[in-house]
Structures are given as C-alpha cells and as structure tokens.
Amino acid sequence: MDIVEAINTRRSIRAFKPDPVPRQVLEEILELATRAPSWSNTQPWEFIIVGGPKLEEIKRALDPMIEKKEISRIRPDFIMPQKYPDLYTIRKQTLGKTVFEVKGIERGNKEKRVLWSIQELRCFDVPNVIYICTDRSYYFQERGVNVWPIFDCGLLVENIMLLAPKYGLGTLASVAAVMCPDAVRNVLDIPDSSMILIGILIGYPDYDDPVNQIRSARDPLEKISRWYGFD
C-alpha cells in the first residue's frame, strides 16, 4: 500500500475483532512512526502500550465512575473544547448523526446513547491501546501553555494510523480513552509528570459491523484554501 492509498482509505474504526496485535507488529509500527518531525527534533512523546489483563484492569477502574455517573471525575489532562464555531458544530453533529443511524440509535433513545458513550470510554473493547504522553513541564511554560508538543504528537499519531493498514490493522484516535486519565495513571503507574494526550485504539477491524463502513466527508479544497501568486 503506497502513501496515497493509505491516506485515501484511512477511516476511524469503532468495532474490532478480539485478536490481540502481536508485540513485534506494534514495535515495528512505532519504530517507523517515530520518524515523524518535531520542533528542533525534541521528540516530545512517550508510548504506553497496553493489552490483555492490564487493559481490562483499566476498564474495571472506570466502572465505578460509569455506574455512579461521576462526571466530575472525568477530567482529562488537556483542556477540552467548551464550545465550537458553528461550522465545526455542523461537522461534529453530522458525524454523530451518521454513527447513530448506522448503529440504530434513535434520536430520543437516551439509554442507547448512554450505552454508546460507555462503549467509547471502554475503548470499544479493542485488544490494544497505545497511549501517547508528553512531558508536563514542557507543556506548561511561564508565559502559558506550549502547544507545539501537541502538534508534534499529532504528526506522530498520523504516522501510526497510516502505517496500521499495512499490517491489516485499523485505528481510532480516541479522546474518550483518556477522559479519565487518573484511572489509566493509577493502573499503569504513570507519573504525574507525564500528561496523557490521546489513546490510539489499534486492532483488527470487524468489517461485519456497519459502523466501520462510515467514511466521513471532507470539504472541497476550494472551500478551505486561499491562493496567492498563482495564475
């Protein structure tokens, strides 16, 4: 698979087969992914790769919060959007509507919507998760937050997601996976000096589930670009 095909066929996977990904495969993907560029080659990332009993332990740590609906304990390490510009809201709502329609979740069915949110928090029962962390002292600076490690980690994440199909794997860059970072931190003994940025769900896609057939739309180039100095 060449890079054009990898980019053009990439999609978010939300249903996985139970088969774990071999460690050797994950190591090869991550080794290649670290060729991502970063500010002055700072490489401000750390991988935490989880599967098997430890991943199940993280899910169990989330259960009390889910059962008691302790939303106040859902405090990700990074600030979440408080509101969206109108255009972003439309895009977000369009995707959500598509997912719910494919999964047969009616607009007024709050119970099913809650169950879907729980599935998100539990990482859709994926066999492996790659957590991406960055150094807290590099993110928080005297004059405010330094956004560049987030940008750099984004380049790294894209590499992982584009490499995965070469091995028959699918991925989802999941914010839900890190909505309760303390649960992850406590189970895996991640120090407070490491901020948990994102969780990449990685596994073998279950293409029998129609949710994996969703291909979200993109605005045409002429709508999102301005050109100067060209004929």
Language model: regions and residue ranges:
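Acidic, surface-exposed loops and disordered segments
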Residues: 1-231
